[in-house]
């Protein structure tokens, strides 16, 4: 099932200013969560309707600080005792609809300059998210001394109570060069595209059970034998394998196969910034292009309607977007250092608002096959 709606939250953000020098701890923030789409039960389109029981998270952008609250019947969530600085406020409220979820979500940036109350309204919009999602991406590498990054992996998760199927699904690493306006392009382009065996959409040979984690490793071996900080991926469920190159095929681990004959390397994920996309695999084609050096190349193109989930990550929050906001409105992994062994994982299991700034957190060690959430 595909993404049917996108996050288009009205952002009420403050202008950039110099970082406040004092951490006074006497600031207050109050946000009122409001829907104007008419989608929330009992609401009317165009008429503001407050949303209670929304989970609201506060994340500092200028220092280490985070907090959570739930909006009351009046739609208000409050945070006090705040040091001066810049903050991002995220809100969400979920409503299950079969195998999908309707999520009311939005965020805004706010500036606390000192003691006193800062109040704002956070307008949410709706997204429909899929039960099958990308739960974790480990990409940054584990050993700076040896530049070791071969222990990369992607983890999927089934957040529903139903058995889903991976047959024919495609995992891609996004083509990094943006051509034209991302929001006017109805497809994603991939520099790497690897496909699960089976028939897309209708296949029933490769299940992912309710609340199951599935790990796809670049190389399904024990990397701690080669890097002191490396991951043991010998128990991975799947392995990326490129039959068009000299890739080593680990016995007894099923393969997710490269579909572009012109790409002869393994599924290598950029160590700093890029995007990983999961698609149904029901439609794709290989297209030719001319690279920045004037040489021809090929890439895989997938229609946007086939996208199940996508996660964009970047070490810097001001990185240029490479994935349309219709798939991911934010960035995971801000602040992630190369070869640190850190990973990005969903903040809460099964929570997807199509905004990785909110959905993902940076964790010091990856959790292949399980989650850091207690």
Q: Where in this protein do the model-derived segments appear?
A:
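Short Pro-Gly-centered beta-turn/loop motif in secreted/extracellular proteins
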Residues: 78-86
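Short strand-edge motifs at loop-to-beta-strand transitions and within beta-strands
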Residues: 77, 118-120, 214
